[in-house]
A protein has these predicted regions:
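Acidic/His- and Gly-rich active-site-bordering loop/insert found
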Residues: 2-113, 134-138
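Acidic/histidine-rich catalytic neighborhood of metal-dependent amide-processing enzymes
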Residues: 118-164
């Protein structure tokens, strides 16, 4: 088991730059809850990355809100799936990226709208599966549900039902 952990750490270390680029791309995409085009742009970026990683995806259109992204990896496993949930919207108003674009300061701290809540988590979810795939771990399926309206308590979508 220690060998697998070592291989996973190595995968993460070797992929720091692509992870950082994806994080930058997500943070620099304006996606306040009411910025539907921006939320959908984040959805498109993630969908492309997920499909490239072998994760089957589908988009659920939500009226008056951004799209919801649903993904599934390793669907053939008989074991119960793990569920990774997150959201693609932020609390930031239009123009926040122009005022505060993604950057990493001299202390290694990242800054920008949504840098932690929750765009880092979206990158981590994707790269968790990519790292598991790199060591051929296929013990359980993993499902993803990325909502578009968490910052307003899913007032426009049925995410609460889907998460339940």
């Amino acid at each position: 088991m220690e060998q697998i952990y070592t291989q996973i750490r190595q995968y993460i270390d070797e992929n720091r730059q692509p992870m950082l680029k994806l994080w930058r791309d997500l943070v620099n995409t304006e996606s306040g809850t009411l910025q539907i085009d921006g939320v959908n742009a984040v959805c498109s970026i993630l969908r492309r990355e997920m499909e490239n990683a072998g994760i089957h995806t589908r988009v659920r259109a939500i009226q008056n809100s951004g799209d919801m992204l649903i993904g599934e990896w390793n669907p053939g496993s008989a074991k119960a799936p793990l569920l990774l949930i997150g959201h693609m919207d932020t609390v930031f108003k239009e123009g926040a990226v122009k005022e505060n674009p993604f950057r990493v300061d001299e202390n290694g701290m990242a800054h920008g709208p949504g840098v932690l809540d929750m765009k880092a988590g979206l990158v981590m979810a994707l790269y968790t599966v990519k790292a598991l795939d790199s060591v051929d771990w296929k013990e359980r399926p993993i499902k993803f549900i990325f909502a578009s309206d968490e910052e307003n308590l899913h007032m426009r979508s049925d995410a609460k039902k889907i998460f339940a």
